[in-house]
Amino acid sequence: MIPPCDPSPHHRSDDRVFQKSALRLNVSPYFDGFIRKISSRVRLAEEHVEAVKRLSLEGPVIYALKNKSRLNRLLIREAARRGNIPVPFWSMGEDASFADLPASVNGTQPPNGEEAASILARRESAVLQLGSSGLVHDPAVEEALIGLIHLQRHLPDPVYIVPVLISYGRRRDLQDENLFNILFGQFDDVGPVRRMIALLRYANKLAVIPAQALNLKAYLAEHERLSQDELLWQLRGELIGRIDEEREATVGPILKSRHEFIERILQDVSFIGYLKALEEREKKPLPVLLKESRRYLHEIASDYSETFIELWEKLLTWLWKNIYDGVIVDRKGLAGIREISRQMPLVVVPCHRSHIDYLLLSYVFYKENIQLPFVAAGINLSFWPVGYIFRKSGAFFIRRSFKGLELYGEVFSRYIKAMMAEKMPIEFFIEGGRSRTGKMVMPKYGLLSMILRAYQEEGMKNLGIIPVYIGYDRVIEEKSYIQELEGMPKRGERTSDVIKNRKVIRKRYGQVYVNIGEPIIFKDYMEKRGLVLDAMEDRERQALYRKISYEIALSINRVSVVTPSALVAAAFLTQDRREIRHDRWKAVLDTFRTYLASRRVPFAATFQEADKAVSGALDIFLREQMITVDDAGRAPSGQGETIYTLPGEKRLLIDYYKNMIIHYFLPLSFLSLSVLSRKEDSLPLGVILEDYVFLKKLFRHEFIFDEEKNDEDEIREELVYLADRGHIDFEDGKAPQTVTVRGNGEEALDAFAGLMRSYLESYWLVTRSVSLAGKEEREEKEWMKEIRRLGLQFHKDGELRRYESLSQQNFQGAIRFLADTGLVSLTEKEARKFYRLSGAPASLDEIRRRIFRFLH
């Protein structure tokens, strides 16, 4: 709900005043009542309301409409009333022979110059009708603009002209329209009957969207040298242009049909040249290569249908109400996306946590009147009927690997280039696949590189890259994720899986969160670094693509939401014991929450009532038996002796939610591990820094670090935090730089260190497995099974204390680290990977001992 403005002479919020002075048209009371009822559904975004209110405090507001329409004027009047923003008093730019009869000061005629000046001085509002095109001479509009310019030159305050788009729906314009849409689906520059039909057809999707306001006083000062005719032509064109930009930002560019899109690629001269060169190399006839290319394009290409979008809108609205408790969106960030989409093509790059992600952003953009992106989906989702539905909803499909598929790679690259040439917004997941662990997966930049190459080859002026965080209190795939982490092979998606998953509707999964990261405006990004794509060698471009992909991932991490379930999970997994007392768990949780608050990270809105939010998450953990409390361990209310039990097999699931926020703790966790691993009373800063660098290197395939930050500066910042809380003695800048643990500081450090110990156990286990295997070559899948069998035995014997350390993903990260250091080598035979010890066993033992030291 938008709070009303304070009543003032300049902005009247009393409905009786609005009724008296607002624009009234010569329509019947019945029609007026109908419009009022219809307009109750009109969406006027809160940020737009606030923007207009701010303008009205500085000067009078004039609403500018592109097409002359009595209906649109009524809609803007009602939207203004409902939003409690200035309501239009009269209308300008009417054709004399068809003018409505507004209730002006006299009650019958539009105000004369003196009356209009008086009205504007009181900061009353009006509607300015611009006509359909700035290229067409329109005496009535020009007369209205001349009058408005004259009034502005005699007013001390600026007059703000707010161009307004009246959107009757989100239907994209198609290059080849069907007859029904030509007759009944259009609403720009049409007569009253067809406009009314459009209103009835899209009544639930009406939106009033103000574009960027024009300060008329500043505009006249900037263009004072223009003649009157030039000024009128330019001003009218500017206002119409802003409405057109807003429309494209809302619905996107005009779409070609799928058939035309495919044929355009196949008939491209440069693509034919590529195929002829391939014909020479591979000795395949050109018609065969063309046939293969067409087959690939039919596999890849989307087949957008507005009907499916409208169906999804209804289905997803039901989903958010019945399975989730709503979607919490970053409205300021979305407003930024809208602003960028007015100026340049968009690439939206979210993280990937659930199959629902494919639909979520499109749903949010649809509701917020932002053009819908075309989403890159994995080929595993192309099975019927899901693939058909996704394709009709704007998805295009990509294979997991292009290896050995030169023609497919070229065709896919051409498809991306064609989309970029049409300024179609693209959405793809920077991690490639869904994260099975809850944390950000290392970014994949293959698709990003194709997009940036298309940007370069098409000579585009600019490109907006938008990182987006998507998070869930709980994901519906959690069970299958844990099975994969435990070593069960991933099954391909099937229609039967969708049917079986109907049982998810019997559960509640909390809230969904959408936060917008810092956009990368590519032209500005390159200029700031003095880089020019055309001047870069291929190796330099690859390094650039990789760097940008990591910056996208970092940006997503910075806006990831601390949810109650993530904080509850983190507090449970700091220790390796099966049981934990409520008081100890709550103390750890409060320690973590205090630290996160000091770092000003985003918290879920439910933390406004923190105790209630935590209790709610705890209840879910108990209800889902992720933790248990037996009768003997349940204390009477208020005694604080309740004991929670963590079943070993459930720790992997709890670990998933802990990992959602673990990146916020990395510097402090590494520091705590270093301090606790040493027996000295006073530890030199240099020793801590050495351990910190080692741990960053060890986990370079697990976590995304900001390489632009100085390691020592990060450590000092965390030491100052611990010292301020009384956990350690440390005086920054005072020699010698040493750290001494104070009082109960060891307990706090142990909590932070505990967040990383499952990863350390995983890596230690892999080094043990390599040592036991010696120089023997191991096939990857079989080796992973052996590591898990060994880990289960060590866990049973007590050598491994955390069941969550038996994670396939962690094993893979450890293997990549050992390959980086040259301790294991990788060979590929017939698309299978084989590993063997290739470094000195003593070097491997040294790493294993160093990891072990952090565990004890």
Residue ranges and their predicted role:
Residues 1-856:
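Membrane-interfacial terminal anchoring regions of lipid-handling membrane enzymes
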